[in-house]
Amino acid sequence: MDIKDSLYIFQGVCTNVVDGDTIDVILDLGFKTSAERRLRLINVDTPERGQDNFREATNFTKLCVEGQKIYIQTYKDDVFGRYLAKVYYNSDNEVRCLNDDLKTEGLLKPYSKWNKK
């Protein structure tokens, strides 16, 4: 599947990394329309400020997507008004899923109910 041609996946740019699982983006909605949104990565929960591995998870997310063109598959919004999303990015000409990579790198908060397989 070519991610650029998939329905319901938006192209955007990550403008800020709040923490390992929350980013700010400018979404390209098409027809010369864009929107700024805060996204929460779906099915992953990284450590919060002051917790072990907060800096590592945040820096990993920054390295992968900050300032980069990304692809975003959105779901519903959460109780804080952030859209839940899967975020895809290019790494060495390979499309990667940030949500999956945070899991693979072992950067999730242990025993969190929000971490799903």
Give residue ranges: language-model regions.
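Small beta-barrel nucleic-acid-binding modules, primarily SNase/OB-fold domains
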Residues: 1-117
